[in-house]
């Protein structure tokens, strides 16, 4: 939602302050296929394996999202 950096619905998330819905100090992310232990996963790490004629989708190192590369193998 607007103004939220993370989903504050779960107080158990160590990356997100449930009271403010903001990332905790030092955290880059709180969830996502390219987020691990509150940090972005390094560039080139497979976040979604190849399927059919499509290549692997990989993390960018700049975001917690796993972008679709849109490339055929």
Curated annotation (Swiss-Prot):
Expressed by the venom gland. One of its GO terms (cellular component) is extracellular region. SUPFAM superfamilies: Blood coagulation inhibitor (disintegrin) (SSF57552). PROSITE patterns: DISINTEGRIN_1, DISINTEGRIN_2. Keywords: Cell adhesion impairing toxin, Disulfide bond, Hemostasis impairing toxin, Platelet aggregation inhibiting toxin, Secreted, Toxin. One of its GO terms (molecular function) is toxin activity. It is found in: Secreted. Disulfide bonds join 6-21, 8-16, 15-38, 29-35, 34-59, 47-66. Its main location: secreted. The keyword Disulfide bond applies. Residues 1-73 form the Disintegrin domain. A motif (Cell attachment site) lies at residues 51-53. Monomer (disintegrin). The disintegrin belongs to the medium disintegrin subfamily. Belongs to the venom metalloproteinase (M12B) family. P-II subfamily. P-IIa sub-subfamily. This is Disintegrin mojastin-2.
